[in-house]
């Protein structure tokens, strides 16, 4: 990203044409980053709540006063010797996407404090842990090599809106004669540009993968040599797949059997063949197993032998040997303490739990949560079952500190809101989950108002808490210099990174042509320790698994992000919200007609957990039996002050303890038909 600065103000944001994987392209949302930075709603000074929780009444205070009070209150909650420090919970995710402004000084602070640990599961942990269980790490093919593929299967990814740089390479391949197949319940912008679209039911991706395997076996489209030398556990999965003929897979997926046969034929007979997998498909009960089944497919046909063959879900695991996470986060500051772990995806339930409450697994909850420190996240908008999340954050006895750019739904319920810098105002280091380049993010302009980087806020708070370890004196540049291991140990030299702006990892062109996966044996683990052989798991909520529930709520709902939002980020940018208009629900014409719904009409979407209202859009983007509730809108910016997470639940995926956002049954009716009881 290249920022044009005039008189100390960022006036334009462009892509860097010299950056190899992106070639100067920016998506619409990031191209408006200057508008976001100078938004009239920026929080530029520390704020303290003076009214009731959620009243929106705050007063401006100085940094010293705010930090002193926060430190005093956290110290009081932690108790003598920090005995009750687990009652304090950090809550963060990927807001800055950076190594420094993410988990460096913040991690040091909470390790030293002995606070509860956070299981950061809200986005990708089901697929990520599934990939690690199969390949040994979150690793895959080079994104640049898709340009040379002859078949590209885009599975669970609206790449035009969420992975623009991959899409550029896919288009190059298409122009050279490659076939593109999109697998997605929704007829996305990407699906419209592919040669074929398989619109399966949400949560049935594992069944489709097993049906493809069945056809690979019976037609002998297998690379027996690659399977024998570079996989473990194939016989058991082979037996399982043979029980999934196309007819069974198709019936489960809600598609035609010929679609399964055709996909298997294309995949089994085309070289090089590549899969671009993304995280939408793993946000259901069986998402981890489905990701494992899909990740095994390239091994069965020997796709990894070609540099333009294989699979990419995430490349972030390639950086695992380059980053010195211990130097950044200092887990040694915990000493002998072993704090409990809170799953960020069940924060709605956990904020309402009492001390020692018996949990479903037979364990005890531990101390009631008394304080939350939120940074790089907006949980009131993005966490599942938001009715419970709001109820927890609204507790008057909960002390909440939020580091933010804006008064988000979460900030509205805080006791203190501390102004944080944006990407244009601080130093950071970035790695990628879509390519293999590390980048440096230099500050382009001085911080606005009294905004401080996350690192600076936690550094100052540590001083107020009396944490005198030398590591809390590290500057951001000090952190940047130790973030990566030396080049001789697989990392990067900071001076080189700063001089060039980016550095590429040294990874083989065809990394698994001869096996060499990151597992102990170097083989793809079809039978993975602790997980066994993957299988199809039906959704928590579906006609097959919960017929009585489905009779009341017959429509499956998925909630992918709006094209011009990054989950809840950018929702308050006026120009982008102007493009999106208002929250909508996409619904199939037949499903709409059966309910007396016409396009543009206000509808009510509901289940036992809650309800929302928005505008219906009737058309082909939704397949029969599925509605698409696009998000993630801030509740306060939606017409009914709610969003789709009012309807989602907190049950977790099979692998990775992740939320199953897309495993959700609802009913829809005209808003005018509802009469409050």
Model feature map: region roles:
Residues 49-63, 79, 83, 219-257, ...:
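N-terminal leader/propeptide and maturation segments of large enzyme subunits in energy/redox metabolism
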Residues 66-88, 142-150, 240, 261-274, ...:
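Glycine-rich phosphate/diphosphate-binding loops that line cofactor/substrate pockets in enzymes
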Residues 1-221, 256, 375, 637-677:
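N-terminal export/assembly segments and adjacent metallocofactor-ligating motifs
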Residues 448, 454-500, 573-586, 590-677:
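Long, contiguous, secondary-structure-rich segments that constitute the structural scaffold
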Residues 103-171, 176-183, 206-210, 296-413, ...:
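Extended redox/cofactor-interaction regions of prokaryotic respiratory oxidoreductases
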Residues 192-200, 421-424, 436-448:
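Short beta-alpha connecting loops at secondary-structure transitions
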Residues 118, 223-224, 260, 274-275, ...:
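Acidic/polar loop patches that form or flank catalytic/metal-binding clefts of enzymes
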Residues 212, 232-353:
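Active-site phosphate/pyrophosphate-binding segments
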